[in-house]
Regions:
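Charge-rich amphipathic alpha-helical interaction elements
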Residues: 1-112
Length: 112
């Protein structure tokens, strides 16, 4: 019993460390995403102010085109961040399921 128990205990510790690391990564990515959203919001207003200031000038069309390109890239980055967060959450759930399976095995082992 002790050998099996020790193996299960080691696996559980290793998985717990992985879970903690995944949680930390997800938290950090979520922080970066919030910062990016704040940056995006302020940049959007600045771009609009610049475009309004250029109305009637020959640069207005170029600014509008550039703003649309930048908005596309920012949306793409936002989606990439969201995909990253989703994949980290899936990995966390997988690790939690593995830990739960070990709990079950340990309980079964203790009843022998």
């Amino acid at each position: 019993m002790t050998k099996d128990w020790d193996e299960l205990d080691q696996k559980e510790r290793k998985l717990s460390e992985q879970l903690e690391e995944m949680s930390h990564r997800r938290f950090r990515v979520e922080q970066i995403l919030r910062d990016f959203e704040d940056y995006d919001r302020s940049l959007y207003f600045s771009e609009n102010d610049l475009w309004e200031a250029s109305l009637g000038s020959r640069y207005a069309y170029q600014l509008e085109e550039r703003n649309q390109e930048l908005q596309y890239h920012r949306r793409q980055m936002f989606h990439d961040f969201c995909d990253c967060i989703d994949s980290l959450k899936k990995e966390e759930r997988r690790i939690e399921d593995d830990i739960e399976a070990i709990y079950y095995k340990k309980r079964k082992e203790s009843l022998k």
